[in-house]
């Protein structure tokens, strides 16, 4: 990691924390809406990231397993809930997608472990599910009669952030082992990963400041 990437990485974490603070400042006004769970989610993600960064100084643990089995599944399942359960009002879709994602750990452990092509099958599959939900959300917003007021739709900012970060970096994490052999390409994509993560959390902050949502 070069000095620029180190700066981006540190900024990423603190912007996550800043976003959590912005969200918590809006908790009182959203206590009766499901968006309060998004606030809790952002706060927990920051805590998880802080543990991932500094927790090793106090307790020995595998960061790879921590992220693969705790942090990332938590993030994916929350977004499935936010999109399928709440935005689309489809409880069955949420449970189906969550189950499919959890089942993807089976082939990931038994068939793709140690693969030099696919870095993490369960992450790739989870991101693919999220990509489908993102496209569905765009369709919902585009066909909405309230499209003219898209800038006041909190979900617009969330969806854009998820698109840039999770969907935009899907090829990077899927073909990580292949890309690492091409250092220049890998560095460019890693820079994008860090920048898009920062932009995503800034968009999450904007969603609380500018966005409004009924429910």
Label each residue range with its predicted role:
Residues 2-215:
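Terminal, non-globular segments
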């Amino acid at each position: 990691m070069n000095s620029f990437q180190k700066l981006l990485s540190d900024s990423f974490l603190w912007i996550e924390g800043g976003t959590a603070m912005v969200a918590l400042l809006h908790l009182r006004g959203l206590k009766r809406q499901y968006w309060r769970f998004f606030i809790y989610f952002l706060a927990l993600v920051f805590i998880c990231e802080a543990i991932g960064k500094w927790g090793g100084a106090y307790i020995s643990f595998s960061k790879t397993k921590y992220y693969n089995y705790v942090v990332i599944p938590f993030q994916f399942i929350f977004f499935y809930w936010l999109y399928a359960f709440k935005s689309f009002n489809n409880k069955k879709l949420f449970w189906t997608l969550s189950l499919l994602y959890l089942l993807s750990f089976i082939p990931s452990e038994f068939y793709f472990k140690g693969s030099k092509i696919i870095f993490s099958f369960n992450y790739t599959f989870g991101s693919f599910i999220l990509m489908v939900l993102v496209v569905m959300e765009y369709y919902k917003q585009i066909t909405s009669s309230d499209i003219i007021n898209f800038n006041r739709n909190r979900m617009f900012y969330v969806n854009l952030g998820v698109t840039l970060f999770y969907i935009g970096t899907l090829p990077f994490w899927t073909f990580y082992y292949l890309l690492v052999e091409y250092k220049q390409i890998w560095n460019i994509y890693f820079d994008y990963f860090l920048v898009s993560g920062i932009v995503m959390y800034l968009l999450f902050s904007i969603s609380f400041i500018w966005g409004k949502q009924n429910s």
